[in-house]
Amino acid sequence: MDSEVQRDGRILDLIDDAWREDKLPYEDVAIPLNELPEPEQDNGGTTESVKEQEMKWTDLALQYLHENVPPIGN
């Protein structure tokens, strides 16, 4: 039947008891500040890092909007 899951036996070779019991260390990991999400979640609750937010502006080329403003008047 199409609605039943077909298990792939090859994955069983990758996962063993030692792998299941392996734990990550509880030590601190140094993360650059521009990779961290914004600390104030009052601004919309974004989970994007500062770097990701800056890239969004360059993806849309919005940083050039203020340079291409037509002159006011004649």
From Swiss-Prot:
PANTHER family according to UniProt: ANAPHASE-PROMOTING COMPLEX SUBUNIT 13
Principal localisation: nucleus
GO cellular component: anaphase-promoting complex
GO biological process: anaphase-promoting complex-dependent catabolic process; cell division; protein branched polyubiquitination; protein K11-linked ubiquitination; protein K48-linked ubiquitination; regulation of meiotic cell cycle; regulation of mitotic cell cycle
Pfam families linked to this entry: Apc13p
Subunit structure: The mammalian APC/C is composed at least of 14 distinct subunits ANAPC1, ANAPC2, CDC27/APC3, ANAPC4, ANAPC5, CDC16/APC6, ANAPC7, CDC23/APC8, ANAPC10, ANAPC11, CDC26/APC12, ANAPC13, ANAPC15 and ANAPC16 that assemble into a complex of at least 19 chains with a combined molecular mass of around 1.2 MDa; APC/C interacts with FZR1 and FBXO5.
Family: Belongs to the APC13 family.
Keyword annotations from UniProtKB, A to Z: Cell cycle, Cell division, Mitosis, Nucleus, Ubl conjugation pathway
Protein's UniProt name: Anaphase-promoting complex subunit 13
Function as written in the Swiss-Prot or TrEMBL entry: Component of the anaphase promoting complex/cyclosome (APC/C), a cell cycle-regulated E3 ubiquitin ligase that controls progression through mitosis and the G1 phase of the cell cycle. The APC/C complex acts by mediating ubiquitination and subsequent degradation of target proteins: it mainly mediates the formation of 'Lys-11'-linked polyubiquitin chains and, to a lower extent, the formation of 'Lys-48'- and 'Lys-63'-linked polyubiquitin chains. The APC/C complex catalyzes assembly of branched 'Lys-11'-/'Lys-48'-linked branched ubiquitin chains on target proteins.
Subcellular location: Nucleus
Region (Disordered): 33-53
Pathway: Protein modification; protein ubiquitination
